[in-house]
Design a protein with these regions (language model features):
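C-terminal alpha-helical interaction module
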Residues: 2-364
Length: 364
């Protein structure tokens, strides 16, 4: 099993076991924190090293959807459904891609309750778990899943593989025809939305994986994942002081590098927004409201970085993106779910963030 510090520089088709086109992503260790029944509330003990470092498990389902008949899953309107949490940075990237490509009429979407107890992600009305609410009898609810009437996302995993025993994660791309999970890896789902579903997209000209910068883009995307996306979790879930300090230093060294890169460039690759920008965005949007305090990533805030902060505002203000972000879900999930980090489950009122003020990056 690959640990959190490992990734493979190869292209791989999870169905055929053959090398993929370079347009399709590398296999990487990417997972959002979600649970199967009986697994501790944040992550499995198997994901903690002997020296207190957090190490992610591997993705479970890696089938591929194609538009050329090369796989068992053809791209089609209305066949696939996306299950996500708006709290999860990994799942949120798929929601962003669905919005940017204009795939709302092609791919359905269901959002789980941001609060996750020992039974895992639930298809429950989020009003039941607002801060300060009683968390008793949470298993008494009507499902909000319009497709299968699942009560818990774990049911989708069990329907796909009855022997599945690992953590249940978001995002999940569900096939309504075969009644199984096609893929639960956002690093696969995003390029599938970009390429395989392009004929059904209302924004066909939006290409978030431009071929001409593929090598450099993939290298930077890996850097952001390894040091920033996963870096906040390495700091937040460290169980030894030394492991925490190493993770925190590595994270802020990477943020400093991104701040420098954005000094003379509006986006990571000039004036064009690509996948790596949205990968970084999904961590930045959560940083000051949860990672800075909850995960002790507190050397600096994003608002303390002039370029990164302006860049965050710029991306947030792109058409449709604000609809994909829920600060409420983000704060409720982290502060109420990670009981071992926040035993009182009190959700802080702040910080106050203004994501609509001028970003000042138009001249770059």
């Amino acid at each position: 099993m690959l640990g959190a510090s490992s990734f493979l520089y190869l292209f791989w088709d999870g169905k055929s076991g053959k090398a993929r086109s370079p347009q399709q992503p590398r296999v990487r260790v990417l997972f959002c924190h979600a649970l199967n029944t009986g697994v501790p509330s944040s992550h499995s003990p198997r994901e903690q090293s002997a020296v207190g470092e957090f190490q992610r498990q591997e993705d479970a389902f890696r089938e591929w959807i194609s538009n050329d008949g090369s796989t068992s899953y053809p791209a089609a309107v209305g066949r696939y459904h996306l299950y996500v949490s708006l709290a999860c940075p990994w799942a949120s990237r798929t929601v962003v891609f669905r919005k940017l490509k204009g795939l709302e009429n092609a791919i359905g979407l269901t959002i789980v309750d941001p609060f996750r107890d020992e039974k895992g992600w639930a298809f429950r009305d989020p009003e039941r778990t607002k801060p300060g609410s009683s968390l008793k009898d949470l298993d008494k609810f009507e499902s909000t899943d319009p497709i299968n009437r699942f009560r818990y996302l774990s049911e989708a995993y069990q329907a796909t593989d009855p022997n599945f025993k690992e953590r249940v994660t978001v995002p999940v791309l569900w096939d309504k025809e075969t009644k199984r999970i096609v893929n639960n890896c956002e690093d696969d789902i995003c390029p599938m939305f970009n390429f395989a579903f392009n004929e059904f997209a209302s924004n066909k000209d939006v290409d978030l994986f431009p071929k001409e910068i593929e090598v450099e883009h993939n290298k930077l995307s890996d850097f952001i994942y390894e040091n920033i996306n996963n870096g906040v979790y390495r700091a937040g879930f460290a169980t030894r002081q030394q492991a925490y300090e190493r993770a925190c230093k590595r994270l802020f060294d990477a943020l400093d590098e991104m701040e420098k890169r954005l000094t003379e460039s509006r986006y990571l690759f000039g004036k064009r927004i690509v996948e790596a920008d949205w990968r970084l965005f999904c961590t930045l949007i959560r940083f000051d409201v949860v990672y800075h305090g909850h995960f002790k990533c507190n050397l600096r805030r994003i608002i303390d970085y002039p370029n990164l902060h302006g860049y965050l505002l710029d991306l947030y203000q792109q058409p449709g993106i604000a609809e994909t972000v829920s600060i409420d879900h983000i704060k409720r999930h982290y502060y109420m779910t990670h009981e071992e980090i926040n035993p009182t489950r009190i959700v802080p009122l702040g910080p106050i963030v203004d994501l609509t003020k001028p970003h000042g990056r138009e001249t770059l």
